[in-house]
Amino acid sequence: MRKTDKKNQLPAEELLKRYKKRYRAVLIVLAAFVALTAFYVYLNYDYLAFKHFITGAYIYTDTLDEIYRKELGTDIKGKYYRNFDDMVISVVTKRISSEKGDKYTYLYTPSQLVKQNEEEKQEAAQSEIKVLNDRALYLRLTNFSRYTLDFMKDNAEKLKSRKNIIIDLRDNRGGDIDAMVDMSGMFLPKKTVVATDQFRWWEHVYRSGRNQPLKYDKIIILQNGNTASASENMIAALNDNLDNVDLIGSETFGKGIGQFTLPLKRGYAVKATILKWYTPNDINIQGNGIDPETPYTGGDILQFALDRL
């Protein structure tokens, strides 16, 4: 038995009303889109007009070629309009950097971004875990990234095999804050404050999401002047929240600011400083590193640390 199509049974006037409603809805959406586009063009008129004016009318194209080549590191082959935004971003970020001394704000060209990602992966591959004796483990972390996070997860059982651990963060210049929070959280009770990020208009508190899968009688952290950013954050997270942590080495770098890398079109990206971060004890370390509880600059720091367990 075939089902009847109730829609086709509606009177012609009712069908017409329905189609009119749909037509009006489409018109409203289209009108809103046109209005928003016009408003956007109005707000950005000066920039858009300048972009069209310079890329389409400026006669000294050899000057343009040189500027594009200098800023983007490649010959854009006369495609001034297409590459204009990336060139402007490069110029502006360099000016910001020179004015403020903020060396962490800049444009990535496609080749630079690929190189940076590959170097991050290669650096992470140098992380290692060693069993030192029947009481202690050695964990060296070379950066904070999805690679080192996976490294720790993959070796979770090995990390549980001893009652003491020496974490080597020397020359670790930091990395991704989300990876750092997850990695630090392995040593902390659930919902423990790891860090607070202060943005221009709001703040975000990071808390550990695990129930301390890695517990030790004693944790020793090795640090030096190249221990920076997310590494310093991990040191503060463990040292502020646990009573069994000993910091050995020299004062850390003192980087209490954070950056975000924003992907752009055609493989470009822009990195900019967008936050200050605070330790669980509400301290911003920018310009002032973390002092070790046990200063040490002699040889064989690993044996020195092992003797303190």
Feature locations, PLM:
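Flexible, low-complexity junctional segments that flank or bridge functional domains
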Residues: 2-165, 169-178, 182-185, 189-195, ...
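Soluble periplasmic/extracytoplasmic beta-strand elements of cell-envelope proteins
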Residues: 53, 93-95, 137-142, 164-170, ...
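Extracellular/periplasmic catalytic domains that process cell-envelope and extracellular macromolecules
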Residues: 121, 129-133, 158-161, 212-216, ...
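Gly/Ser/Thr-rich loop/hinge elements
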Residues: 121-124, 173-222, 226-229, 257-262, ...
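A generic structural signal for alpha->beta connector loops
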Residues: 126, 191, 216, 242-244, ...
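Short, well-structured beta-strand/strand-turn elements
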Residues: 226, 241-255
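Non-catalytic, well-ordered alpha-helical segments in soluble enzyme domains
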Residues: 231, 235, 239-243
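Low-complexity, Gly/Ser/Thr/Pro-rich intrinsically disordered linker/tail segments
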Residues: 293, 298-309
